[in-house]
Each structure stands twice: as C-alpha cells, then as structure tokens.
From Swiss-Prot:
Belongs to the TVP18 family. GO terms for biological process: vesicle-mediated transport. InterPro entries: TVP18/Ca-channel_flower. This is Golgi apparatus membrane protein TVP18. Golgi membrane protein involved in vesicular trafficking. It comes from Scheffersomyces stipitis (strain ATCC 58785 / CBS 6054 / NBRC 10063 / NRRL Y-11545). It is found in: Golgi apparatus membrane. Glycans are attached at residue 24. Its main location: Golgi. It is a multi-pass membrane protein. It comes from the Eukaryota.
Length: 172
C-alpha cells in the first residue's frame, strides 16, 4: 500500500483544481498564505546575513512564517505540544475578518522594513497583502470561510483513500 509520488501530486493538483473551481476568496487566501510560508522561511533566512537592522526584520519574518504555518495548517496544533493559551490564540483566526487583519498586520510589519533597506522581504509583504486582500474580499462578499479540500491519500471513495485516511486518523 505504498503511495507513489505521482499519485500524491495527482491528488494535490486535483484538490487544488477543485478549490479554484469553487471561486471562494478564502480558499485563494489560504493558498497565497501557504506560498507566503515558504517565502517567509526562505527570504527570512536569506536576509539574515545583512549587516544592518534588516536582521531584526528577517527574524520577524521567520517567526511570521512559523505562525502562519500554524494558522493555515491547524492539524499541526494537535501534533506539536503548545500551551492551551497559544492554541486558543491561533484558533481565533478561523474566520475571514480575523485572518484578513492577521495578514494585513504581518504585511505592515514587513512593509516597514523598506524604511531600513529595500530587500527581498518586499516580496513577503506583497504576498501577505494579497492574502489579506483575498480574505477581505471573502468577508465583504459574505462568502463562507472554507478550508482546502486537498487529500494526499486520494478520494474517500477509493480503497487507497480510505486506508490512507484511517492511517492519518490514527496518527492524529
């Protein structure tokens, strides 16, 4: 019952396609948020080698990437041991308006880094702004808050998908 890389990528891209067909801005915001996680970690580390106060913004960017990871992938809260206070704080962002504010606050912090020096952290600020904008559009148009429907294990109707879901359920 080994999952092939091809079947995993096929399931991811079919789930991504299904998400975009729903035309819900909260799903778009979630995907932009997931991309911003990778950008935060990569560009935060890349900019940490500046010999100026940009180092502070780089460290903040890395921390933002880790917090956004927990906001966008809440199953990690069950796996990693966190205090109940921190877990409840992260769970506050389970609606469109709170996520909009969260992303726009993160964007504002990274936009301030331009005052020190123009670096590649501008890309992170842009992605945070776009994610915040997507969640704002979802809230303004009264779209319900949705989470991505990607299932790496396959469709629930297939035997492979049912076994994969059972394994994941037992782990969590």
């Amino acid at each position: 019952m080994a999952f092939s890389i091809q079947s995993i990528f096929s399931n991811i891209f079919s789930g991504l396609s299904a998400d975009f067909k729903k035309k819900n801005f909260s799903l778009y915001g979630q995907w932009v948020g997931i991309i911003s996680i990778l950008l935060c970690l990569a560009l935060g580390v890349a900019n940490i080698f500046h010999a100026s106060i940009v180092i502070v913004f780089s460290i903040i960017c890395i921390v933002q990437g880790l917090v956004v990871t927990l906001v966008e992938m809440p199953f990690l809260l069950k796996i990693c041991p966190f205090t109940e206070t921190f877990t409840n704080f992260i769970k506050n962002f389970d609606a469109n308006w709170p996520r909009c504010g969260f992303y726009l606050l993160n964007a504002a912090i990274q936009w301030v880094s331009i005052a020190v020096m123009a670096t590649s952290l501008i890309v992170v600020a842009c992605f945070f702004t776009v994610a915040g904008g997507c969640y704002a559009l979802a809230a303004i148009t009264h779209q319900e808050y949705l989470k991505s429907s990607i299932q790496v294990t396959g469709s629930p109707d297939s035997v492979e998908g049912q076994i994969g879901q059972h394994v994941v359920r037992n782990v969590l």
